[in-house]
């Protein structure tokens, strides 16, 4: 084999840095606002961060740009390799649940990138949230690479690398106010059109219900009583509905008591059901919930939401026709 052929036969290696440019910041902004949701990807493969040697650590990431960028930005001044799996542009935690951040893809990516020819060691550092999708035993059996799970948050990696031991605090998955605030734009975009229509036609109650479910709920999440997201949503929705119900009851003192009570009841039925449904959507955005728990919650509470919403709508129409 000639030197030229050997050159082209080397494992493919992409270069990256730990800093962001304007294009990266724009990508982050668009991703947060759900613009081109399928387009926030990096090419799967092996990346060199800084000037790694064959003894440098190997980290594993999803090919969702926010996941990849969170990892590389946390590795300032740490020469290393990043093995990017093809998770179809989905973050680590969600991809682990769907199976794309999984054993087969990890094994395949090790083989395709010929990682064993790039590094002298046989250690991989995976994100903790990727653990549900990967069998470390199976990966070692098929590739001879040992799987090691790093801390829950990429920002703790520099400290973790000193001992390769995660403290209890590093293992704890947090869902801080800032984490919750970053979820609001993408949730808000999905309801922007109905929200605008409701405001234009003057239906302030349902509009408030949507804002409560998409904006207030993630902010107030830790302080709303109960464990289930649905019941939290019902509680928040009832609190939002109460002023509307009181205003409806007091609006026309000359009307019959049953009419005023019915109008108040409309708000107490519609708003909590809408807010609870939107709150339930947040179960997919936090590690506080499990797949089985979410399924139980859906079966338990979605029928209640539907009945409340239907009853509120029917009552609203009925009052109009009776009057």
Question: Across the structure, where does each feature detected by a protein language model lie?
Answer:
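Soluble N-terminal domains of membrane-associated systems
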Residues: 1-151
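Catalytic or ion-coupling anion/metal-binding cores of large enzyme and transporter domains
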Residues: 2-7, 28-29, 156-160, 169, ...
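Cytosolic juxtamembrane amphipathic/interface segments immediately preceding
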Residues: 41-46, 170-187
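Extended, hydrophilic extramembrane loops/domains of integral membrane proteins
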Residues: 139-172
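Non-transmembrane, extramembrane segments of multi-pass ion/lipid transporters
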Residues: 163-180, 287-296
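Core alpha-helical transmembrane segments of integral membrane proteins
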Residues: 181-253
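Generic detector of multi-pass transmembrane helix bundles and their immediately adjacent loops
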Residues: 218, 234-323
